[in-house]
């Protein structure tokens, strides 16, 4: 693999060119085989932005999830018009140049998955959602909350144990929490879904498939699950 850069004024800016050369080589290797990558400034700017967000995410997770918030999107019964639940949505903001900047979930969630930080961050969301559900059930009997579960959580953590822990901590019935299983980022999640489905059935935890049909979840695989 080969990374190619156009080096002008190399001696004056050696450190910067060294970083760019390392970046270009990594890009070439990521292409597979004997890939050749020609340095693009926009690619490098995007890379630096991602590294900055990753650093902020690591800091937030180790600092009691400062910068993370959970928003709730109401779930409404169409027949009655009443609110019967909510979907928990993870949000993240960080300081950049002294100003608070909200980062799109499209940007930060893949980075959480890439770094494995989605596991502790996911537990944070679960706990926050369970606490909110406990409070809301005092006013709306039967209120439930939907929580998105990443494929990384399915593969690399005992997510069903995390869900049970949150349910038990707030003395909630199992049906009060519904896991939305997302499939993005992995092509064949069938074995993991099957195992998780069995665990959920045993513990009477509801689950649904999010973004149905965008990845592994064609009808053939659904039959297997």
Locate the predicted segments by residue.
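C-di-GMP signaling machinery
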Residues: 8, 14, 23-69, 79, ...
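Active-site core of bacterial EAL-family cyclic-dinucleotide phosphodiesterase domains
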Residues: 49-111, 148, 209
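Catalytic core of bacterial c-di-GMP phosphodiesterases, primarily the EAL and HD-GYP domains
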Residues: 6, 17, 46, 80-84, ...
């Amino acid at each position: 693999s080969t990374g190619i850069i156009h080096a002008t004024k190399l001696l004056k800016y050696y450190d910067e060119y060294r970083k760019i050369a390392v970046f270009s080589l990594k890009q070439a290797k990521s292409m597979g085989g004997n890939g050749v990558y020609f340095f693009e400034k926009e690619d490098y700017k995007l890379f630096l932005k991602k590294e900055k967000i990753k650093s902020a995410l690591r800091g937030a997770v180790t600092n009691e999830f400062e910068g993370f918030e959970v928003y709730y999107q109401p779930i409404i019964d169409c027949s009655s018009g009443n609110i019967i639940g909510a979907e928990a949505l993870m949000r993240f903001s960080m300081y950049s140049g002294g100003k608070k900047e909200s980062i799109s979930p499209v940007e930060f969630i893949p980075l959480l998955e890439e770094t494995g930080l989605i596991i502790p961050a996911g537990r944070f969301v679960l706990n926050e959602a369970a606490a909110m559900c406990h409070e809301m059930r005092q006013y709306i009997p039967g209120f439930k909350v939907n929580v998105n579960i990443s494929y990384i959580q399915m593969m690399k953590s005992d997510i069903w144990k995390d869900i049970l822990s949150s349910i038990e901590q707030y003395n909630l019935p199992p049906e009060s929490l519904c896991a939305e299983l997302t499939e993005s980022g992995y092509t064949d999640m069938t074995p993991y879904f099957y195992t998780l489905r069995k665990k959920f059935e045993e513990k009477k935890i509801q689950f649904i498939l999010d973004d149905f049909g965008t990845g592994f979840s064609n009808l053939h695989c659904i039959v297997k699950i």
